[in-house]
Amino acid sequence: MQFRIEHDTMGEIKVDDSQYWGAQTQRSLENFKIGTEKMPKELIGAFAKLKRSLAVVNHKLGKLSLEKSQAIIKACDCILKGELCGEFPLAIWQTGSGTQTNMNLNEVIANKATEILGGNFREKKLIHPNDDVNMSQSSNDTFPTAMHVVSVLEITHKLLPSLENLLKTFKEKSQQFKEIVKIGRTHLQDATPLTLGQEFSGYASMLEHSKQQILESLEHLRELAIGGTAVGTGLNAHKELSEKVAEELSQFSGVKFISAPNKFHALTSHDAIAYAHGAFKALAANLMKIANDIRWLASGPRCGLGELNIPENEPGSSIMPGKVNPTQCEAMTMVAVQVMGNDTAIGIAASQGNFELNVFKPVIIYNFLQSLRLLSDSMESFNIHCASGIEPNKEKIDYYLHHSLMLVTALNPHVGYENAAKIAKNAHKKGISLKESALELKLLSAEDFDQFVVPEKMIGPKA
């Protein structure tokens, strides 16, 4: 391996000559050999979009030459095309402001831009990482800006489409199953009837609510900290910078961003991300409930509830031949647990905004993006490999429906609650049907029982 000598304000340091990064990135690599968690590539992409927009705006404001602006823009485009993906090796366990990652971007962009201008960054840097790429910026405002940019983009382009696909499937299943009457269950005990379609409509409504909660959380995530520089005052930044960068980012990404109205808030608090992740946690709770319901309803095949048949995707046991497990449901529930854990970490980290700056930014955005990615991927997987293939086991559903003692509820208006309870308890004690019990107790005639106890008429309120 060949090395070159790079320098920063702390002196000289050896850097792998094949890499574009510089001294500060190298120091971070050597000083923070902690864990395996690296800065997410999605965050690096958002940072590149931000640096690109800043190069455009700094030129428009007369602070950066056209030549340097265009070189920086082209270097950022190289990052966005994936041409420099091996240049961002830093761990999330670094300074809590994300300074090392900001400088990682600055150094790589500066050296690539120098090459674009025809120079050799190993000999002389035509673009300076601080003076040019980081012009009018601080890590304290660029990192939280990149956090919000990546959050909005990933929610818009990854999470919401996956959620919408699963929601669509449950809406379709709700219609497909609307004529299938089944027994309901509360407290894990038999309850009154409903249709399988009604049950699935509940799942669809849960996901619709989650979608709306996530959409609502987007509004404050659109607010960008850029222009606040070190402590929120905007020192060394043009007064029009923040508004113009938000406009440029919006135009370039095709997604709306605005300048945060209070930069002191934007630097020291991450309540917008904590709030958005709260919506993720609510979605995870809904997905956990749905996946659990489906695997219980599909339990069996001979000794469980068995009301649903789910796709058989792979062998389920290394010792029991022919066993097939609800693997997609299990994967979904594990994702939900991880998201709930991430929510706790984000909540604690977001509370640590001491004075003018929160210094838990990397761990906040790492966990946020992990939750987003896991939710998106698991919903897509669950939809394709499980939800879309769910079918009712009508024989089992009908058996449970007509053997449930809770059909006695339909008799309340005719014989009263206490007499209805006597019918149910007598039937359960003697192992006979509700009809047989009612006749034995001489509370109803056979004709009246058949008229009053009709499961298909018990699935909605009466006129």
From Swiss-Prot:
Active site positions: 187 (proton donor/acceptor), 317
Name this protein carries in UniProt: Fumarate hydratase class II
Matches recorded under NCBIfam families: fumC_II, PRK12273.1
Keyword DNA-binding (UniProt): no
Pfam annotation, one family: FumaraseC_C
Native source organism of the sequence: Helicobacter pylori (strain J99 / ATCC 700824)
EC number: 4.2.1.2
Further comment found in the protein's record: There are 2 substrate-binding sites: the catalytic A site, and the non-catalytic B site that may play a role in the transfer of substrate or product between the active site and the solvent. Alternatively, the B site may bind allosteric effectors.
Matching CDD domains: Fumarase_classII
Role noted for this protein: Involved in the TCA cycle. Catalyzes the stereospecific interconversion of fumarate to L-malate.
Binding site residues for substrate: 97-99, 128-131, 138-140, 186, 318, 323-325
Catalysis: reaction(s): (S)-malate = fumarate + H2O
GO cellular component: cytoplasm
Site (Important for catalytic activity): 330
UniProt keyword annotations, A-Z: Cytoplasm, Lyase, Tricarboxylic acid cycle
InterPro entries xref list: Fum_hydII (IPR005677), Fumarase/histidase_N (IPR024083), Fumarase_C_C (IPR018951), Fumarate_lyase_CS (IPR020557), Fumarate_lyase_fam (IPR000362), Fumarate_lyase_N (IPR022761), L-Aspartase-like (IPR008948)
Family: Belongs to the class-II fumarase/aspartase family. Fumarase subfamily.
Subunit structure: Homotetramer.
Top-level division of the source organism's lineage: Bacteria
Enzyme class per UniProt: lyase
Phylogenetic lineage: Bacteria, Pseudomonadati, Campylobacterota, Epsilonproteobacteria, Campylobacterales
Pathway the protein contributes to: Carbohydrate metabolism; tricarboxylic acid cycle; (S)-malate from fumarate: step 1/1
